[in-house]
């Protein structure tokens, strides 16, 4: 069968590569993809994510069995609804179900209604009221744009002044446009963060290995928030009892609640969690695979990925198996200056194969050449599976030291939280 992956980043590269390795899959198209993906035998389609009608026409012309939707903005724009209306199958939530991600206020309302543990909060569209709430609550405190903001709409403010400034930028200065026209202001939760993913159809779900992402740009969790600078899975120091608690107090009630609300969920559910003294609590929901977590979770899948997704969509019990030993670790290489201003067109090192996988995010061929150049903030990611986090770090960082990363940067401490002296 022929499949279509919608999106262009490292996440979509990992999804498409895994689908192409599946038994019954002959060809995988990625729209729009990036040039680095072609090195893995993937076919690019020059249609951007927002052009739903062109994507649908392409899927029909090329007899695509189903589409896998990667990015959040496409889901929020109703791409799955449009595919379904055209008689095509797509793996991802409808616009109504995706509101769990594209409105943080809606997600909070669902959590409160279905008794899901999360931070206390207030939602505001009026700056003066938001300011008064911040001053009343004190710092540290968290200010979030209600809508989608490319993973950059969250400010963990260490002072009241910082929080007020963040609220002002969103509500008065229009920093995130409509996405920041409302803000959710939350209590700061103290603890270690981790991610839990599940394949979902309605109230049926299948949990994936736990993962830990590294959001800040620089070593030691310093610098601005990014889309993610690296990750590893599973999280070796996280007790299974914590995962079980998260499943029973968070994943199950939320999915059953969405069914009860008439918004049944299909796709990948990503729960951003924090382990507090009171147990796991929700920081955020994402209604699709995470980036960079996808790149370290999918290499651990030992069953047939395309068959698994097909079964889940058809309501058939899937046979899903995971590698149950070792750790998969990945480090993102980004353009200098990311997540703020950065240059494009930096020459990239040659692709690694074998023990170290290269997933491309922002990469394009130079004109009239097969040399890859940087074409985005996050550029590529190196991933390996080893016996331990330390062994994974050694493998990746040795490889990176041998690469010419002039004009690029990466964190040197991905996975260090898992190494307990």
Curated annotation (Swiss-Prot):
Ligase keyword on record: yes
Record pathway: Purine metabolism; IMP biosynthesis via de novo pathway; N(1)-(5-phospho-D-ribosyl)glycinamide from 5-phospho-alpha-D-ribose 1-diphosphate: step 2/2
EC number(s) stated in the UniProt entry for this protein: 6.3.4.13
Reaction(s) catalysed by this chain's protein: 5-phospho-beta-D-ribosylamine + glycine + ATP = N(1)-(5-phospho-beta-D-ribosyl)glycinamide + ADP + phosphate + H(+)
Positions that bind ATP: 134-195
Family (UniProt): Belongs to the GARS family.
HAMAP family: GARS
Name of the featured protein: Phosphoribosylamine--glycine ligase
Organism per entry: Streptococcus pyogenes serotype M18 (strain MGAS8232)
């Amino acid at each position: 069968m022929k499949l279509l992956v919608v999106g262009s980043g490292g996440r979509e590269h990992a999804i498409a590569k895994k689908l192409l390795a599946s038994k019954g899959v002959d060809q995988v198209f990625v729209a729009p993809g990036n040039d680095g993906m072609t090195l893995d035998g993937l076919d690019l389609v020059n249609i951007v994510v927002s052009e739903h009608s062109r994507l649908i026409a392409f899927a029909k012309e090329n007899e695509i069995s189903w589409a896998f939707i990667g990015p959040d903005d496409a889901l929020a724009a109703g791409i799955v609804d449009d595919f379904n209306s055209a008689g095509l199958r797509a793996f991802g939530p409808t616009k109504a179900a995706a509101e769990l991600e594209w409105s943080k206020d809606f997600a909070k309302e669902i959590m409160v209604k279905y008794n899901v543990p999360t931070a206390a909060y207030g939602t505001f569209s009026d700056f003066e009221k938001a300011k008064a709430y911040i001053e009343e609550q004190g710092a540290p405190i968290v200010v979030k744009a209600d809508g989608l903001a490319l993973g950059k709409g969250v400010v963990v403010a260490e002072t009241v002044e910082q929080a007020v400034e963040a609220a002002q930028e969103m509500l008065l200065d229009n920093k995130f446009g409509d996405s920041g026209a409302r803000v959710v202001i939350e209590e700061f939760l103290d603890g270690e963060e981790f991610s839990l993913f599940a394949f979902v159809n309605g109230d049926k779900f299948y949990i994936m290995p736990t993962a830990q992402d590294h959001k800040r740009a620089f070593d030691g969790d310093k610098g601005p928030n990014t889309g993610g600078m690296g990750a590893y899975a599973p999280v070796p120091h996280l007790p299974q009892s914590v995962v079980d608690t998260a499943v029973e107090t968070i994943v199950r009630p939320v999915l059953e609640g969405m069914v009860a609300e008439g918004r049944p969920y299909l796709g990948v559910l990503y729960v951003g969690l924090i382990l507090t003294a009171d147990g796991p609590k929700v920081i955020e929901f994402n209604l699709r695979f995470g980036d960079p977590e996808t790149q370290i979770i999918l290499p651990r899948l030992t069953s047939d990925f395309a068959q698994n997704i097909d079964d889940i969509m058809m309501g058939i019990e899937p046979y899903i198996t995971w590698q149950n030993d070792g750790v998969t670790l990945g480090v993102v290489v980004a353009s200098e200056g990311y997540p703020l201003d950065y240059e494009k067109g930096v020459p990239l090192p040659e692709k690694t194969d074998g023990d170290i996988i290269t997933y491309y995010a922002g990469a394009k061929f130079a004109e009239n050449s097969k040399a890859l150049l940087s074409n985005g903030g996050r550029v590529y990611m190196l991933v390996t599976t080893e016996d331990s986090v330390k062994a994974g770090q050694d493998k990746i960082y040795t490889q990176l030291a041998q690469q010419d990363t002039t004009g690029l940067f990466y964190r040197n401490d991905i996975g260090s939280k898992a190494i307990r002296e």
